[in-house]
């Protein structure tokens, strides 16, 4: 509950103490015990070993992580090749613009960022269109999403839209 509420309360005999608990979790883990899966030439883990390894992170904890991604090994050509990348200044500018959009949108709701969206605020200020509702219904059923997972997708989608200056 502290992750959702942004506060943690400790009850002791002499009273209750409440502390802020806003944080951003950034975590990484190997795909298996040896770290080389899915490269079967270097990974010697059995399927059961991989499954047990991945189950070390509890479902309820995973359900509270907004974005999970798999990273492929970097190819040599990517390290040495010249390619156009967005500058840090350009990214910073987009993020600040997204923050301004969020602060303006949620001013009356008493929040500042998409990460603070409650179910009620999402329903009032981030209504889904017919097409989006259909997509979310299909995702809810096929991915067997929890309510938390459903609203997490909407919060992340709202953030992506803000970064792309879209409604």
Predicted regions span which residues?
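Basic, amphipathic alpha-helical bundle interface domains used for macromolecular binding and assembly
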Residues: 2-167
